[in-house]
Structure formats: C-alpha cells, structure tokens
Design a protein with these regions (language model features):
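N-terminal Rossmann-like NAD(P) cofactor-binding subdomain of oxidoreductases
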Residues: 1-182
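Anionic group-transfer/hydrolysis microenvironments
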Residues: 95-96, 187, 198
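Short glycine-/aliphatic-rich beta-strand segments at the starts of folded cytosolic domains
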Residues: 182-191
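Conserved small/polar residues in nucleotide/adenosyl-binding loops
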Residues: 192-199
Length: 199
C-alpha cells in the first residue's frame, strides 16, 4: 500500500503537484495533504474525493509515508524533511533548502539518476531544470566547456504572495513579498539571499 503526502498542498506549486499527479495518473493508495496552520482545514477536491488539509506537525511528519512531495519553503523543509526521511519516506523537495547539500541528490530525471545516499531528493529551480535537459543532449553529442546563463524569474516563483504583489501593485498597493514594488520593476532576487549573495 503506497502512502503519499503533499506538503504545501494549498500553495501555488502544491496545487500544480496535485494536478500533475492527476494528469499522469500516478498510482497510490492513500493521500494526505499538509499545509501550515493558516491553511489547515481547507478542503481540496482530488480525483472525485474531498480531502481536508492537515497542519504539518512533528508527530505527523514522524508517521510512515512512502513518498512525500514538499513545496513549503526552505525553513519547513529543513525542519520536516529529515523527520519524514527518518520515518522511511523518500522526500522530493522543491525548495532551495537541499540544493547545495553534498549528501543530497539534486535530480532532473531526464539528466541524472538518484543515488539514494539519503532519502531526500532535491530538485533544481524551474529555470535550471528547463536548461539542463537540452544542455545534456548537447553535452552528450558535442561536449560543453562552459555555459553562461542568465534568467529572469517570474513572480510566481515567490508563490501566491508574489503574484498578489504584482496584481495589487498595478493599483499602487505596497508589496508584501518583496522589499520594493514589483509592478514595472525588476528585482535581483527570487528568494532570500544567502551569505554568498545567491538567491
């Protein structure tokens, strides 16, 4: 019996995860949807059933799940992914938390296979995923010495708050997700900056 959890199920990426699970008809026997306390109690329709979104707690993360899809931010992932892992789950995390960790696989399925040195798998951000798939083809065919790559990220990368800032910024409302108005603007960040000024 396959038990699957989606963490951040009411967020922008979490809802897309559910859409993809449905569209690809991914098999599982039990589904549990988690969110923050703020969104707990919401109801989500999925494959003809109504699921009540539950608050993610240490106790719930210590239950056995086979697979956990996480998209709830780096802090949530840092705290809860190891708990899910310790309880036996394979955790696929969409946050930036584990991307630079040496003992965590950073996976794009079309490019590399997981080694499963740990039960946590990180995925790169969206622009990296889209670039490495064709770059892998070029690398295999011709070899690459260097790639210079610049991206401009959508506000949706900041989740619902980022989209809200853009929509409400048109009318001059002060931003919540960004330090400056994003409407008619470009900001050099997509998340919080690290000490190396990466985001």
């Amino acid at each position: 019996m396959t038990k699957l959890a989606v963490v951040g199920a009411t967020g922008l990426v979490g809802t897309k995860m559910l859409e993809t699970l449905n569209r690809k008809n991914i098999p599982f026997d039990e589904l549990v949807l988690f969110s923050s306390a703020r969104s707990a109690g919401q109801e989500v329709e999925f494959q003809g059933k109504t699921y009540t979104v539950q608050e993610l707690t240490d106790a719930r993360a210590s239950e056995h799940f086979d697979y956990v899809l996480m998209s709830a931010g780096g802090g949530t992932s840092e705290h809860f992914a190891p708990l899910f892992e310790k309880a036996g789950a394979i955790v696929i995390d969409n946050s930036s938390q584990w991307r630079m960790a040496e003992d965590i696989d950073l996976i794009v399925p079309e490019v590399n296979e997981p080694t499963f040195t740990r039960g946590i798998i990180a995925n790169p951000n969206c622009s990296t995923i889209q670039s490495v798939v064709p770059l892998k083809v070029l690398q295999d065919a011709y070899g690459l010495k260097r790639v210079a790559y610049t991206t401009y990220q959508a506000v949706s990368g900041s989740g619902m708050k980022g989209k809200k800032d853009l929509a409400e910024g048109i009318n001059g409302k002060a931003p919540e997700a960004y330090p400056h108005p994003i409407y008619n603007n470009v900001l050099p960040r997509s998340e919080e900056h690290t000490s190396e000024l990466q985001s």
